[in-house]
Amino acid sequence: MAERRIIHIDMDYFFAQVEMRDNPTLKGKPVIVGGKASTRGVVSTASYEARKYGVHSAMPMSQAHKLCPNGYYVRARFDAYREASAVIMSIFKSYTDIVEPMSLDEAYLDITHLVRPDLSASKIATFIRRDIFEQTGLTSSAGVSYNKFLAKLASGMNKPNGMKVIDYNNVNDILMNLDIGDFPGVGKASKKVMHNHDIYTGKDLYDKTEFELIRWFGKRGRGLYLKARGIDHSEVKATRVRKSVGTERTFSTDVNDDEEILQKIWELSGKTAERLSKLQKSGSTVTVKLKTYQYETFSKQRSLREAVSRDIDIYNVAYDLYNDLKDPDVPIRLIGVTVGNLEQSRYENMTIYDFIER
C-alpha cells in the first residue's frame, strides 16, 4: 500500500490579497478587511503589513483602528472572494477529486495516487501553487506530509508564498521543538491550560501520558497524545464528484479587441483541454463566460452531440459562443471557458504525468 501523501493549501491573507490584486494601489500597505467599526464589526483578514501593528483576524475593528490608525480599511466583498475561491477549488479538482475544502481559502488534497518516483508530492504542490498564481494572481502556501495534521502544520511554517515538507526524517525535530501554541487546534484557552500543566513545547506534550491528557482535556486528550507523536489517521473527505472543468482569466486592463480576446480564448481552450487530459475526461457542453468592465456577467452554453476534449474542438465552440455574446462597444475584464457534462474520455489523452513533465 502506497504511503499517503497529503497537501494542505492555505491562501495567503486571502481577502486582503484579493483587494490588493483588484486595487494595486493597496499593495505594500497595511490593509484591513472587515466590517464597520461603528457596527461592532470585526477584522476578517489583515495583510502582513497590518499584522506588524498587532492587527489580526477576529479582532474588533474599533481596536484595529486604535492599533493601526493609518491603515487602509476595506469593506469585505464576499462575491469577489467566492469567485476567486471557485477558481482555486477548480484547480485543486483538476489534479485530484479527493479534495476537502475547509473554507474559501483552504483545503486538503489527497494526492497519494499521483505520486511516482519521478513525480514527488512537493513537485505536485509546486505545480498547484503555480496554477493558482497564474489564474488568479494570488499567492498561496502549502504543507506536504503523510497525514492531514502534519500537512496543516507545515503549510503555516513558511508563509507567505512558501512550502514546507514534513516527513519521517524531520518530524520529530519539528514536533519536539514546536511551541505548544503553534499546534493546529490549540487556541488561547487551550494554551493557558497547557501552561498550567507545564506544557510549553511539543516535547512537553510528548512526555505526558495519555491518561493525564484525557484527564485534563477530556476526549481531546487522546488526539493530543497522538498528534504529539505525529499520528493522524483521519482521511481527506471528498465533497462531490467533479461535473465540469474550466479556466478563466482576468485581463490586466479592460479589452474590446477581438484579436486579443480570441487569442485568450484559444489559450483557455488549451488549458481546459490539458485539465481534461489529466482527468482522462471529455465533456458534451461548452460554456463561455464574459465579465464586462462594469462587472456584469454574461454566459452562453452549447450542448454537443459528441463529447469534446481537444483544444481545437473546444475552441471552435467557444469561438461561436463568444461571437454570440460579444458587444463591440462594451470592453470586458474577464473571460472563461468551461467544459461540462463530463464522461470518461474515449481519446488516448496524455496522462497527468505526461502533462506535468512537459
UniProtKB/Swiss-Prot annotation:
Active site: 106
Annotated site location: Substrate discrimination: 15
Catalytic reactions of this protein: DNA(n) + a 2'-deoxyribonucleoside 5'-triphosphate = DNA(n+1) + diphosphate
Gene: dinB
An individual GO BP term: SOS response
Subunit relationships: Monomer.
InterPro entries in UniProt: DNA/RNA_pol_sf, DNA_pol_Y-fam_lit_finger_sf, DNA_pol_Y-fam_little_finger, DNA_polymerase-Y, DNApol_IV, Rev_trsase/Diguanyl_cyclase, UmuC
The organism's place on the tree of life at top rank: Bacteria
Annotated family: Belongs to the DNA polymerase type-Y family.
Cofactor binding note: Binds 2 magnesium ions per subunit.
Disulfide-linked positions: none
Ranges where the UmuC domain occurs: 6-187
Protein name from the UniProt record: DNA polymerase IV
Enzyme class (EC, first level): transferase
Sorted UniProt keywords: Cytoplasm, DNA damage, DNA repair, DNA replication, DNA-binding, DNA-directed DNA polymerase, Magnesium, Metal-binding, Mutator protein, Nucleotidyltransferase, Transferase
